[in-house]
Amino acid sequence: MQTADGSNTVYNAVVGENYHSRNGALQESRHVFVNAGLHYFLDTTRANTVSVLEVGFGTGLNFLLTADYCTAQNITLDYCGIEAYPLSPEMIGQTGYEQYVSRGLWQQFNQQYTQSMLAPTTLNANSQLPTANRQTSTANCQLQIAHCKLLQFDTEKTFDIVYFDAFAAAHQPEMWNEEAIAYTVKFMKPGGIFVTYAITGNLKRMLKALGLTIQKIPGAAGKREMLRGILEVRD
């Protein structure tokens, strides 16, 4: 279905909710995750590498926008998405998101989407650039999609940023309880960033108890506020 900003979302019949806000899939993804998460981290750290854990990979829009920016800025990206109900490759190809990212990235994503659920895969997002441009880019983009529920996910990695993009608590309350939030936070690096479209008193209390400093910032269209948390660095 088309959302208010003209971008598309997909309805998940199992959960009973769309993957993105009806007020605009593209604007929500850019505002909540790319701007408040990725850009904030890069602006404050000046890093040339970044790792992202997304809870709720969904349509892949957050990944695509993140990878497109990192490729353009020559930033190495390690991206892991958790998804219990992965969309089919055919559905991914029908989202229309190719208009928001480079042709090379879109083609690589579609080609590697299924493979990335089996093992981490490297996307050569610069494959459609002229040879001279490709040679000046040293950044790479690694994608892994974990086809499992959150509490079944495991890795030895820790991440710079968490995109917490689970379905709303009204549809998936188990994703917003203390066990799920604590399990997610354990995969964060000290100083790491946690961003989500939701902000509730209970969520703020849980994150504070887990050692995060909470920032309330303006939300995407249709929401007054969103939440950004920063995991405190402890001696």
Name each model feature, range by range:
Residues 49-58:
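Conserved class I S-adenosyl-L-methionine
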Residues 200-235:
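Class I S-adenosyl-L-methionine
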Residues 1-50, 67-101:
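Rossmann-like AdoMet
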Residues 93-155:
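S-adenosyl-L-methionine
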Residues 177-190:
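A short glycine-rich, Lys/Arg-flanked "PGG" loop and its adjoining helix->strand segment in the class I
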Residues 143-145, 159-166:
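Short SAM/SAH-binding signature in class I
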Residues 191-198:
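Conserved beta-strand signature within the Rossmann-like core of class I S-adenosyl-L-methionine
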Residues 60-64:
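Glycine-rich SAM-binding Motif I of class I
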